[in-house]
A protein has these predicted regions:
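C-terminal boundary and immediately downstream tail of ABC-type ATPase nucleotide-binding domains
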Residues: 81-107, 133-135, 154
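Short aromatic-centered micro-motifs
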Residues: 65, 108-109
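Short aromatic-glycine-enriched beta-strand elements
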Residues: 168-173
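ABC ATPase nucleotide-binding domains
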Residues: 1-86
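Short, basic/aromatic beta-hairpin or loop at an interaction surface
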Residues: 106-108, 175-182
C-alpha cells in the first residue's frame, strides 16, 4: 500500500530502504514479484538499499556493492553474479571465494595454502603473478566418503563442520588442512546416504571446469 501511494505521486526519484526486510520468506517472494512488476513501469529512478542479495539481483538493473564503506563493484546483476569482485560479494551471493595468485599453467596458488586447478588451456586474467579470486558454486562441490576416482582435478580431504537447510537443499561446511573452508550444496537424500553429521570425514571434489577466476 505504501508503495502504491508513493508511485501514485509520480516521483522522479524513489528510495526503497530494505523494502522486504520485515516480511516472512513466503510473503517476501510474492511481494518481490509484485514490486518488480510495478518498478518495470516506473518512469523515474529507483534506488533500493538492501542486504539481501536475492533482492538486489532480482529487482535492480544495476548493482552497486559497498564493502567497508567503499564501492567494490558496480555492474549489471548478471555480471555481479558471474564475476564477483571480492570474497564478500561472492559469499553474499552464496558462492565459495578464495583469494590467491595466478600461476603460469592455469593454476591458482591459494592465499591460505593449497593449489587450485582450472580448466586446461584457460588463460587467467590478468596473467601469471596477479592477485585473483577463484569462485566455486556450492552445487559444483561433490562430497564422497572415499577418495573419488575419475576426472575431478581438485580433490581434498576434509571434515564436516556444519549442515544448514536452505530451502529444499542442505549446505555443508567442510574444513580441510589443505585448502580454505568449502561449502557444498546437496540434497537431504544425498546427505542421508552419506550419513553426514558434524565431524564426518569426507572427500571434496571440484572439476576444473567449475572454477571461475577473476582478477582483483
Amino acid at each position: 500500500m505504501a508503495l502504491a501511494r508513493a508511485l501514485a505521486a509520480r516521483p522522479r526519484l524513489l528510495l526503497l530502504d530494505e523494502p522486504l526486510a520485515a516480511l516472512d520468506q513466503t510473503t517476501r517472494a510474492r511481494v518481490r514479484h509484485t514490486l518488480r512488476r510495478h518498478l518495470a513501469g516506473f518512469g523515474g529512478v529507483c534506488l533500493i538499499v538492501t542486504h539481501d542479495p536475492v533482492e538486489a539481483v532480482s529487482l535492480a538493473d544495476r548493482v552497486l556493492v559497498l564493502e567497508g564503506g567503499e564501492a567494490v563493484q558496480d555492474a549489471p546483476p548478471a555480471e555481479v553474479t558471474r564475476h564477483p569482485r571480492s570474497p564478500w560479494v561472492a559469499r553474499m551471493l552464496g558462492g565459495n571465494a578464495w583469494e590467491g595468485t595466478a600461476g603460469p599453467d592455469g593454476t591458482v596458488e591459494l592465499a591460505g595454502g593449497g593449489l587450485l586447478t582450472t580448466a586446461p588451456g584457460e588463460a587467467i586474467p590478468p596473467g601469471p603473478g596477479a592477485l585473483v579470486l577463484a569462485v566455486i558454486a556450492p552445487e559444483a562441490v561433490s562430497l564422497h566418503l572415499a577418495r573419488p576416482e575419475g576426472s575431478p582435478r581438485n580433490v581434498w580431504a576434509g571434515t564436516v563442520r556444519e549442515l544448514t537447510a536452505v530451502g529444499s537443499r542442505l549446505r555443508v561446511l567442510v574444513t580441510s588442512p589443505e585448502v580454505p573452508a568449502l561449502v557444498a550444496e546437496i540434497t537431504p537424500a544425498a546427505a542421508a546416504d552419506l550419513g553426514l553429521t558434524d565431524g564426518t570425514r569426507v572427500w571434496t571434489a571440484v572439476k576444473a571446469t567449475e572454477v571461475t577466476v577473476v582478477g582483483l
